[in-house]
């Protein structure tokens, strides 16, 4: 006897909160996975992490944002981008900010 197989095993979620939560998990978890992987690289490597101006506090600037501007997070997407910036900076300071490190990371 064949069992009817559910082709869509995941419950469909159409609310915006679920979508934002999924995007945020992907952004943050991918950043953590990349940074953790870099800790095990044994050759000279340069990494440029490109984020978005959405990570900064929105103050309706007419000029472009600078990396010294205040991080934001007033909506879920902005919060996840700001979280990624914080993660990258903490990994740089904790693991890659010494003369012996073969890994060089910058954000733009």
Predicted regions and their residues:
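NAD(P)H-binding glycine-rich loop region in Rossmannoid oxidoreductase-like domains
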Residues: 1-25
């Amino acid at each position: 006897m064949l069992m009817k197989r559910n082709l869509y095993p995941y419950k469909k979620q159409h609310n915006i909160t679920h979508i934002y939560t999924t995007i945020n998990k992907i952004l943050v978890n991918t950043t953590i996975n990349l940074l953790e992987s870099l800790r095990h690289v044994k050759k000279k490597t340069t990494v440029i992490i490109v984020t978005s101006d959405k990570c900064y506090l929105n103050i309706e600037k007419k000029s472009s944002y600078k990396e010294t501007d205040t991080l934001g997070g007033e909506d879920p997407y902005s919060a996840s981008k700001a979280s990624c910036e914080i993660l990258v900076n903490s990994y740089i300071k904790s693991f890659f900010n010494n003369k012996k490190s073969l890994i060089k990371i910058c954000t733009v």
